[in-house]
Amino acid sequence: MVSLGGLARKLFGSANDRRVRGYQGRVDAINALEAEMKALSDEALAAKTVEFRQQLAEGKTLDDLLVPAFAVVREAARRVLGLRPFDVQLIGGMILHERSISEMKTGEGKTLVATLPVYLNALAGKGVHVVTVNDYLAQRDAGMMGRIYGFLGLTTGVIVHGLTDEQRRDAYACDVTYATNNELGFDYLRDNMKYERAQMVQRGHFFAIVDEVDSILVDEARTPLIISGPLDDRSDLYNTINDFIPLLSPEDYEIDEKQRSANFSEEGTEKLENLLRQAGLLKGESLYDIENVAIVHHVNNALKAHKLFTRDKDYIVRNDEIVIIDEFTGRMMPGRRYSEGQHQALEAKEKVQIQPENQTLASVTFQNYFRMYEKLAGMTGTAATEAEEFGNIYGLEVVEVPTNLPIKRADEDDEVYRTAGEKYKAIIDEIKAAHERGQPMLVGTTSIEKSELLADMLKKSGFSKFQVLNARYHEQEAFIVAQAGVPGAVTIATNMAGRGTDIQLGGNPDMRIQQELAEVEPGPEREAREKAIREEVQKLKEKALDAGGLYVLATERHESRRIDNQLRGRSGRQGDPGRSKFFLSIQDDLMRIFGSDRMDGMLQKLGLKEGEAIVHPWINKALERAQKKVEARNFDIRKNLLKYDDVLNDQRKVIFEQRLELMDAESVSDTVADMRNEVIEDIVSKRIPERAYAEQWDVTGLKADVQQYFNLDLPVPDWAAEEGIAEDDILERVTAAVDAAAAERAERFGPEIMQYVERSVVLQTLDHLWREHIVNLDHLRSVIGFRGYAQRDPLQEYKSEAFELFQALLVNLRQAVSAQLMRVELVRETPQEPQPLPPMQGHHIDPLTGEDDFAEAPLLAVAPADRNPAEPSSWGKVARNEPCPCGSGKKYKHCHGIYEA
């Protein structure tokens, strides 16, 4: 029986269908302009950009210009690239312009779709960012699509790893900037560690289109971008605690695979306390006393390292290092490290060299970074399953765009076996059968371990005509993917998310030409061989089509339906035929964790014999329910993490905005004076409380405070002994004395140097205290969960205590700045080598690329600024024997270097 909702959808279409139909009027209007645009000369078409900008200046909106602007881009793409955006691509572009996520299947031309809203929004002159998952895609897309923008008079920049600040500044100044999500986030953090506005590279956050938006805004939401510096070596502590874990028995701890958590039981806690006491590591009586917070953190990490992290699944050991394996893609992530001591715990477990922990200097999550943009949109092939999350967290609606050609892929029901052995035997038989009939096959696994297990089984069965694509062999990855569509090819791959490469039936002709003709010079011979390769690939494509297209065989279900859908989506691109099927067993991770006993009992009752499989839509539905549970749990985790991160983010925004104001201000003297006066008021009110009798005044303490914060020896006890003196009189006298001393120093230094000194001291002190504050919040976060046992809401407690810590930061800032400025002296510089900045490193555990963009070289927080001869504040650190930047021709040490604050 059809439900009322189903009947309504049948009559009126779904909400998605209705929204897509709503764009048809504008699509028709764009199509109506096509002949007019074709008739324009190249110059006249390019001149449309100036015309549109003039119309914007006269009061028109971007929405008013959408139809003609899209028509211009379509014609430019046809002339420059030979590509004409289809009607569905125009719809995809409108969805992006309207701050939504455009879900378009693999091979539907998302890269070209982005050019439409990018051009339209770039007309506003505020800069548009197109976000990709790796440097290769950023450069490829900027190179290709930049030709369209260039033809229309817009500039295109690309941000990749290894650029100088000047190159980055130029790229961000362009109308359109292609960049990876990591580079954007790190540039934002680095900009907010600089001391001059001119040193900053980004110019604002207007409009961003995020490619693979589900990977970046969902998969990576739990892994912040971090810039860090090293702490002291604590390898002895890690090794000592690591040695305790094997001494525990199974009843000493509880493991929850679903929640990825490990906790000690009461017996385990007692045993651990005795071991820690013997090692001299336990303070007080209980492990959970507040002074043992750091030790609790270390023992929990050690337990997780032994009981939750599996070698060759979660990480591998290579060259005496722990290398993380990405759970989504199966790729190695060299240089990436687990944070908060977890990586060191794994190093201790595997007896490899323990690298020192890092202190966080600056961090931001992608959730909070991308929410800074005035307009945000995204593209992906798989977003519908995460629609609720996109709506709740980012305010983004997911709109499914129909394919240009109907999808011909057959998605078959799962085959479920009782044991993994039976499942693998069936998979091997299926692989051999597909190979014999010439059907290209992509075999998806969930980990390196599983892909190598299957490869070994295939070899033992006498079949060796396959390629393995996983973290161990990623150097050959591009070529393997390029040939995965050749008839009879068998490619075993860990999860294919974020690969960024289409599997073309018959193989990729461009990749073959690049590889086979790399040494052949341009000319008739090369042209003939290129033609031959293209003809051969076309014949192979026809053969693959006759065999049924690409067959995606998955050996296990991932806990996320989206990752499964990404794997399926590799087949059936651009209307090609294809097939997808999942082979499962009760012993698979997902089945084992979610109700496998019940299903195993049911299969036994059905009388399932060895080697037989059950295929039924009910099984698919049961698995989908299990996956939905996991997805809901993961969403709750991300939502909860965001609530905590929002507390830090609000404070981060205040600090970063304050830094910008300090950098932009002509002088910070008024700010410094306000800080000084607040410190005076604080110490006077503390030592001389309101309405207190003179005998209750702590004048000795006040005298000491004035000495500590202002470097002045004032006769406070003598003032207090005067007849009829009031607390206001003492406040006025202290203020007058401090102001006079500050004015005398300012006159002695001169206004130019004093401004430089004040700004430098305030910014550097603020940065130092902010870093300490981040560490304090991390520590608070690690223990706040225990408040739940006292029937108090941990989040509210965290908000309250984080606010108190922030207020303390502001008090410390006022005191530290006041104390430092009242002590700083101009001294003749003694010969010494310039001190280098401490090493800093960017980190981000990236669930997509596995490419180590940020571990190659230190990320220094302060890059050299452009030097203005008239502005000593712009010179930064100058070597003693360098020519003085003022242009005098003297060495710095004999000119402005004589004095150093």
UniProtKB/Swiss-Prot annotation:
Catalytic activity line of the entry: ATP + H2O + cellular proteinSide 1 = ADP + phosphate + cellular proteinSide 2
Protein localization: Cell inner membrane; Cytoplasm
Any single Pfam family the record assigns to this protein: P-loop_SecA
Lineage of producing organism: Bacteria, Pseudomonadati, Pseudomonadota, Alphaproteobacteria, Hyphomicrobiales
Keyword match Cell membrane: yes
InterPro entries: Helicase_ATP-bd, P-loop_NTPase, SEC_C_motif, SecA, SecA_CS, SecA_DEAD, SecA_motor_DEAD, SecA_preprotein_X-link_dom
Organism: Sinorhizobium fredii (strain NBRC 101917 / NGR234)
Gene3D superfamilies xrefs: 3.10.450.50, Helical scaffold and wing domains of SecA, P-loop containing nucleotide triphosphate hydrolases, SecA, preprotein cross-linking domain
GO molecular function: ATP binding; metal ion binding; protein-exporting ATPase activity
Protein name, entry field: Protein translocase subunit SecA
Co-factor note (free text): May bind 1 zinc ion per subunit.
Known partners and oligomeric status: Monomer and homodimer. Part of the essential Sec protein translocation apparatus which comprises SecA, SecYEG and auxiliary proteins SecDF-YajC and YidC.
